[in-house]
């Protein structure tokens, strides 16, 4: 019934939102009962308070920024109420998506041909060392293969070099549960090394002078996390060979591909030990590979290996962080802002910060407990070292100031445990290794545990008596150290096999601090080969140069795509190379994924406009009791008939309706007294109305929870709300009484104002209170107003006003309707002398002003009460002194003149006005108010 919005209804000047609309805002259609006559109205939905320059009287406007509802009356938009409430429940789960087809399996690269295994030869002399092969040329880049099926989880990547310190990231979501750690193997027997020679006794040092008091040290930098040690391979039994000649320094070769796993070689004669090779040249920095073509988006697979670091992207949008709502002066359009207090993400649009979503995620699952390692093998206790010479006692230094506590360094990863070596002959003693580079200064360590008591040293020679020193000053009491964090519990290793105790080696000289070299890139982890044949221990090779550090890539912006359906498990693909460690991305947490197997949860739809509640549908199957039919109109008066001839005396007929006073007839003959007529037949029952159409079967997932009906006048306090959802409130004020008097005809009472299925969002943590109004009581020489009916939920107060009592000449005014003290509509006026009351006033189908009572007699007749929809006002009593009828309410016809509600209401006449007094009869009572609240879990 609503036409399209015309352009002339749009504003010709800027409204409070700063935008002049040339098209109509979204509209919502509301169905109005067919028996209600009203002008075509429109409902506007927009942001901000409406401007009076658009819209017509009777239109509605919803401000989506505040959920305030406005009604236009007399050219002005009036605030009706606020439709805000608690958030609705989650929507139903969307259907499970179709299963994606398996992707094509990528072609596996060919494995190089394995050399034939040689037969065990007879003892032969060791041949000369072959020349180093030329460096192969770089192969051309292969085309992108088809998308392969998901491969098995790759081996743990080697730790990359420490990246530059990034800016503090946002708190990320808890990661996926890690896989259990690999269980280490047990160590095997090792040969006992030769006992080192006893070092000569050092000369007695001179007495040092007292040092100056040192300045307070600056806080040390946090140490880098240690790399994971490579896993050593096991050696096999072999005879010890002679030491070979020292080879010339070879060029540094390119990094070779990982070869296939070779078979175990047969035992062979021991070769001579080669000389220590010279230090290789530093290799050139490898060229950066080309980017692959972008493939089509496939089904989402399981979590893959860490990808290669991408090229540097262009500068993106700024992401700001703070506590609380961002200031309008902060940032530029397009920037994002994260409120650290609430987890809300804001975007700046048109110079305003608009909340977008919350990035706070759910807590992840607890990871599985790692496997317990096997026990380590027992090792023999080393021999006791020779006691050292007793040094001179130094002077007591000044107490240094307490340094700041350094940051606790990251715990290094546990190195892989090497496999056990098979029994082998003891190798020659290795030469003294070069001194390693000094590591960066670590943070101050926590106080170590008390060591075990050492063995008693041999008694030294008696020293000369020293001079008596001066008594030192008492030192200040040191500050209590902060309690250190509890360290992680290490994995228990297996017990090692018994091994011979090694001799104590000589103490090497202290080397000169070398310059710290650049950290080299970490190579791929090679495939573990089988145990080789026994070989002599070679000399320790020189340390290679440290590779250049790769350039740091830009931080990528995380744009989360839609979650794909879980694909079938693909066949096992080839193991990929370990990717370069990427920089830390900004932590913008996505939505928590659904449990596997279950379909994705549908996106939460944007909040729709709150529609006005339509008419209540018929109950499924069993039909609701139909509304009471309208009272038929009084038939029109017929013309006066001609005087008929005297007929035969008939049986006494039914009493006819009172006719008009006829002309005086001629006196007839006196007739015989007639027999008493038989009782007339009972009138036929009215025809049954047409059967209503069968309603649709009610849903088994009904949102309806229950209803509360308050049909007795009085107070109802702190009543329980059974659900968090929406409540539809129907309420009516009490009716006013008719004016009482016996000397003339007086006005009828007005009906109460009403709410019909008015929607209010509620929470089960709330309660509601209500007052159901008492009907206006008759009183001689006057009338009484019906009481108001009120409902209070939180800070919302709905008031359905009681109807006014009639006066000596006019009918009572109907009850008004207000929300939080603001009048939404007034009641309809009562009729003046001899005139009917005005029918109910509609603001919309949810709010109704009460109908007015009929006016008192004007010397000829009184007026009827005003109507409401299907209910009619009370009929005025006849005669020059007849009383006016009462106004009709939401639930009942008005009471006729000179009648009213009984002292104990029958429960069906809620809110109706009492009839006016007349013809010697007092005026009638008004009927009491009523409240009904229907609770639903969702609109």
From Swiss-Prot:
Recorded protein name is Collagen-like protein 3
Point to the regions of Low complexity compositional bias.
84-95
Q: Where do the segments described as Disordered lie?
A: 84-332, 358-697, 896-923
Its main localization is virion
Q: Which residues are glycosylated?
A: 15, 35, 39, 82, 788, 820, 858, 919, 925
Where does the Collagen-like domain start and stop, copy by copy? 88-147, 148-207, 211-330, 364-423, 427-486, 493-552, 564-622, 638-697
Regions of compositional bias (Gly residues) in chain numbering = 910-923
Q: How is it modified after translation?
A: May be hydroxylated on lysine by the viral-encoded procollagen-lysine,2-oxoglutarate 5-dioxygenase.
Task: Give the stretches traversing the membrane.
Answer: none
This protein's record includes keyword Repeat: yes
Enumerate the UniProt keywords alphabetically: Collagen, Glycoprotein, Hydroxylation, Repeat, Virion
The record's subcellular locations are: Virion
- Tell me the function of this protein: May participate in the formation of a layer of cross-linked glycosylated fibrils at the viral surface thus giving it a hairy-like appearance.
